[in-house]
């Protein structure tokens, strides 16, 4: 190497070192003026399931990006409050935040279902596009503001399965009188199909199914369902999970606690929730296929829903949407926006995604 090149290289290295040192000093100086914050995050999940990773990711990344000044401790369902009472606890300020599914709270506002997933709705990719680019998140946050809460998407399981059944379900008539664990608007659809709907937190599903308190149950997909042991309590595994094609989980934050955070911490928190979305979805996409292979090898019977059931469920779903829109202004506002976005993105994805997937999957 020529002497001039050596000198230039040395100069660049020196400048780079100085710049990094300056940046680190400036960052430390900025963070030195920021407060130490300690939050508690209740959740709707057992720690053993993949859904808990959304809460863990947010907590881990917030701590890392603030050099430990802002720490959030996630708790499993039941450790602080019951799994289906996260919104109540956050609203009351019992905890600063919680990780949950918004559709658990449609009794408070039916439109909250759109924050998670609705029957025959958007897949995970489409859901994110609607939330972040189609105005969906702003619309949902407007509803949550009525509860003194702000929400941020923080995880997705991807398209879910259609549930575990102790007997085969070949037609709509086979659903009548069946006791099934299924929440959200999907539960309302099943109810109209004759199902006796139950809503249970994840940690209670296996025992209820195993002991005959329920005849069927849906949770997430092969990876988590296997962990819960649902394959040991029922044999028939149905697909697709038409009621949750792209469910998003949320972090709910008490607005008073949120407004007390420095702007820097708010931005870090939001960044961590976006990372939680990617982390959880990637995990489920990678692990569900492996788990399904194990389940099938162990005797699980994989069965598609009949066209009769699918068509009946789809019709009832949109009947319920229209009924809710006619009597609930917030639901109507979100639904009309969502419906327009769904129509547009479905048309586009038929061209760019579905055409390829249909060919590629059929040619394997």
Swiss-Prot record:
GO MF: metal ion binding; organic acid binding; organic acid transmembrane transporter activity; protein homodimerization activity
GO BP terms, alphabetized: organic acid transport
Record localization: Periplasm
Regulation: Pyruvate uptake inhibited by 2-oxobutyrate, 2-oxovalerate, 2-oxoisovalerate, 2-oxoisocaproate and 2-oxo-3-methylvalerate.
Subcellular location, principal: periplasm
Presence of keyword Hydrolase: no
Signal peptide: 1-26
InterPro entries according to UniProt: DctP_fam, SBP_TakP-like, TakP/all3028, TRAP_DctP_sf
Gene disruption: observed consequences: Impaired pyruvate uptake.
Highest taxon of source: Bacteria
Keyword Plastid included in the entry's annotation: no
Record's subunit section: Homodimer. The complex comprises the extracytoplasmic solute receptor protein all3028, and the two putative transmembrane proteins alr3026 and alr3027.
Function according to Swiss-Prot or TrEMBL: Part of the tripartite ATP-independent periplasmic (TRAP) transport system involved in the uptake of monocarboxylate 2-oxoacids. This protein specifically binds monocarboxylate 2-oxoacids including pyruvate, 2-oxobutyrate, 2-oxovalerate, 2-oxoisovalerate, 2-oxoisocaproate and 2-oxo-3-methylvalerate. Is not able to bind mannitol.
Name of this chain's protein: Monocarboxylate 2-oxoacid-binding periplasmic protein all3028
